[in-house]
Amino acid sequence: MRIGLTGGIAAGKSTVSARLAELGACVIDYDMLARKVVEPGGAALPRIVETFGGQVLRADGTLDRAWLAEHVFGPFAEPGSRERLDSIEHPLIYREAERLEQTERASRPHAVIVHDIPLLAEVVDALPFRFDHIATVEAPEEARIERMVATRGMTRDQACDRIRHQASAAQRLAIADTIINSTQPLEQMFEQVDRLYSQWNEEA
């Protein structure tokens, strides 16, 4: 059983993902994979330097994420910079995700495997595999902005820029067969997640 899990930035997807892992799902975290491919020695880092220039690196040779974010998501980002970054990172991330899924299925053929993909709505047609179900975690935009300012050290403008560069709620809902409302009390949200996992586990 292959599940796609998505949601807007700061919507609460990580909380849902962690709950599914507790229940026994194998969660493949695409944010973690994205960090891995840009680490020193990672396949994406030299190509990012080639594309964006040496200023994308810190003095210690690691990726300057703040610089890259400003030049990809910021108000003065060069047109097409997001697409260039995605074209470097995404194929490497998909390849590693497939490897992790194959490894899990070798030991647990009927496992519920959750692909935790923040930008699923943007890339769903480009993925080399399809999902049995897709769930999206949603919260009102203003609540998400407040969370980013409070917990991620962003300014309001930076938070709005991040949201602007993601798919809209309507686009996520168009690909999903399940909506998880993260503004409901945590206990109720966990009850919904638990029911979903039981359903997926039975189908697997």
Features from the language model and the residues they span:
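Short, structured coil segments at secondary-structure junctions
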Residues: 23, 52, 129-131, 175-176
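Small-molecule kinase domains that catalyze NTP-dependent phosphoryl transfer to phosphate-bearing small molecules
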Residues: 99, 123-128, 150-203
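ATP-dependent small-molecule kinase phosphotransfer cores
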Residues: 35-111
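An amphipathic alpha-helix signature
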Residues: 23, 45-49, 141-149, 156, ...
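Residue-level signal for inorganic ion chemistry
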Residues: 12, 31, 85, 114, ...
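ATP-dependent NMP and nucleoside kinases share a basic, alpha-helical "lid"
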Residues: 98-107, 113-147
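Glycine-rich phosphate-binding loop of ATP-dependent small-molecule kinases
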Residues: 1-63, 74, 199-204
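Well-ordered beta-strand positions
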Residues: 26, 32, 133, 177-178
